[in-house]
Amino acid sequence: MSSSLKQLKEQFVSDLTGGTIEEIYAVTSIALSSYLSFRLLKKSLGDLALIYDYILNVLTILASITVYSNSPSYLHYFIVIPSLVIYLVNYHVEKPSSPHRQNDTKEDKSDELLPRKQFITAYRSQMLIITNLAILAVDFPIFPRRFAKVETWGTSMMDLGVGSFVFSMGLANSRQLIKNHTDNYKFSWKSYLKTIKQNFIKSVPILVLGAIRFVSVKQLDYQEHETEYGIHWNFFFTLGFLPIVLGILDPVLNLVPRFIIGIGISIAYEVALNKTGLLKFILSSENRLESLITMNKEGIFSFIGYLCIFIIGQSFGSFVLTGYKTKNNLITISKIRISKKQHKKESSSFFSVATTQGLYLACIFYHLAFSLFISNLSFLQPISRRLANFPYVMWVVSYNATFLLCYDLIEKFIPGNLTSTVLDSINNNGLFIFLVSNLLTGFINMSINTLETSNKMAVIILIGYSLTWTLLALYLDKRKIYIKL
């Protein structure tokens, strides 16, 4: 890549200020409309061809960040209204007393501690889809600049996306935590060192990918945005160091509710930013080349915020992933099942919740925390993905709590086994598909000048790009190949 083109591409994603939170929610909620529409159609028509699955769950999201980026409300109508009409017509044609309808209206009551929940698969998969689409789309003019990552202060769709990616990883990671949980935790150096060793080994593949990405970017003279993570750091390093730090914190995480730890660390970091010289140190451009730390200060210090998001994401697993109420699962992990009789007797029954109830309470709590920040802008700094500060953490968590609740309510509104083959396939190899999309993004950027690509051609390229990793996910899933990184 020529140095002049590299500079132009770097300028194209630099010094941006983002957009409004309301617009971000309007655009990203297209995923909810797509999921609702898919369930309505599958409920009415039975199994859908893969092409319709792909159109509803991938192309509609692509349209929301490109062609319909300025009018997402119209796209919501185009997606939902036809499928709703088909569903209502089918509802009146089909006899209400039919066994099929009676079975579907019964609420799912699982006896499994960790059942596979359709709405969680949809949430994680569609979050990956919009992330994969955005990392390439951002290099084309058709992708609005207000959706791209902001320079320092402000909100954008991609800023929200990177935090949501980490949150969803924390949520998924909590499945293993619940499986391995014992109610009578006792610290021992042997088990502690074993945990650190296991987590380090788990981190190695991701850290190697981070190193490969760094070397590739430098060798190929690929465009990079230094104020995003620094000179050497990249998102794979952030993901790779998470298990190591979690292993170090393991004794505390086993004794103190995770949401308290996540919020506590985030508040302590916010105080350090505002009451010491840390904020000035991170944002200063004059100290960039002084040391390895200053070269990568954004990546190193934003890691604290992402760690908090991950830990809070883990805290959701105890009531989101479980198939039934467990003791105090709103605030801590437990395998002790709470029956209806026990629930009435328990003095702490408020903290023993079903999934929907827990999500309602989480939405209220984190939105209040986020609103408290909004009303105290003079006391706190604005939202900053570059810093991953406390306002950013609360924004990401409150958003994901809300969207998880919406996915859950959609599944309850349209009950039944209405799985999407595309979403299942992407979810089953999520991190690997994310890696492939990064490689494809690099290849496309090295092959063409994205800045001079027409909107029509950009959409064609993005469709081909999305089709490539979707087909790969479908192939791997069909062959039962699951690549865990």
Swiss-Prot record:
Q: What is its EC number?
A: 2.3.-.-
Q: If you read the UniProt record, what top EC class would you report for this enzyme, in one word?
A: transferase
Source organism, top-level taxon: Eukaryota
As for what it does, the entry says: Probable acetyltransferase, which acetylates the inositol ring of phosphatidylinositol during biosynthesis of GPI-anchor.
Per the record, the gene is GWT1
* GO MF terms, alphabetically ordered: glucosaminyl-phosphatidylinositol O-acyltransferase activity
Recorded metabolic or biological pathway in which this protein acts: Glycolipid biosynthesis; glycosylphosphatidylinositol-anchor biosynthesis
The GO cellular component terms are: endoplasmic reticulum membrane
**InterPro entries per record:** PIGW/GWT1 (IPR009447)
Q: What Pfam families does this protein's entry cite?
A: GWT1 (PF06423)
What PANTHER family does this protein map onto? PHOSPHATIDYLINOSITOL-GLYCAN BIOSYNTHESIS CLASS W PROTEIN
What GO biological process terms does the UniProt entry carry, in alphabetical order? GPI anchor biosynthetic process
Per the UniProt entry, the glycosylated residues are 103, 180, 417
Q: Which residues cross the membrane?
A: 48-68, 73-93, 123-143, 152-172, 200-217, 229-249, 259-279, 300-320, 359-379, 390-410, 431-451, 457-477
| Family listed | Belongs to the PIGW family.
The topology of this chain with respect to the membrane is: Multi-pass membrane protein
Subcellular compartments: Endoplasmic reticulum membrane
Keyword annotations of the record: Acyltransferase, Endoplasmic reticulum, Glycoprotein, GPI-anchor biosynthesis, Membrane, Transferase, Transmembrane, Transmembrane helix
Give the protein name, as stated in the record. Answer: GPI-anchored wall transfer protein 1
